[in-house]
């Protein structure tokens, strides 16, 4: 039951993020990007990201307790989101700057968790588990870099494919 609940929570967060993204205009009026809209975009993204991170922890950390997979998944997904967003936002002229703030500063920032990763790494080091610590460090840092690049590549491939993404 607990796993189903966390999956549902992640799905609801993703749906809410998609609905908010649909409301962002592709040709913003100057008045559209006000401090209150900026705060709202970042806050909503961060809230959804943090809830998704919590859900991933509930769903995945019990699978292999020596390595908190939920934290790893959160960091890797956040890196992918950043890569997709950088590639997409950089090629769509006139896209509201709120989109980037919502996705990168808010959603990916709330989803990724350097502090939790650091605490888990410290715990492994304190237990003398140097091999597991090195593996965890490599997975988080190397995996995040790889998924950021994969996110950017995804947008590039979608643009070239018959599926396409609107320019």
From Swiss-Prot:
Question: What do the Gene Ontology cellular component annotations say?
Answer: plasma membrane
Keyword annotations: Cell inner membrane, Cell membrane, Ion channel, Ion transport, Membrane, Metal-binding, Sodium, Transmembrane, Transmembrane helix, Transport
Q: Which GO terms describe its biological process?
A: cellular detoxification of fluoride
Has keyword Iron?
no
Single GO MF descriptor: metal ion binding
Q: Which InterPro entries match?
A: FluC (IPR003691)
User: How is this chain's activity regulated?
Assistant: Na(+) is not transported, but it plays an essential structural role and its presence is essential for fluoride channel function.
Report the transmembrane regions from the record: 32-52, 69-89, 102-122, 137-157
Query: Which protein is depicted?
Result: Fluoride-specific ion channel FluC
Which species does this protein come from? Answer: Xanthomonas oryzae pv. oryzae (strain KACC10331 / KXO85)
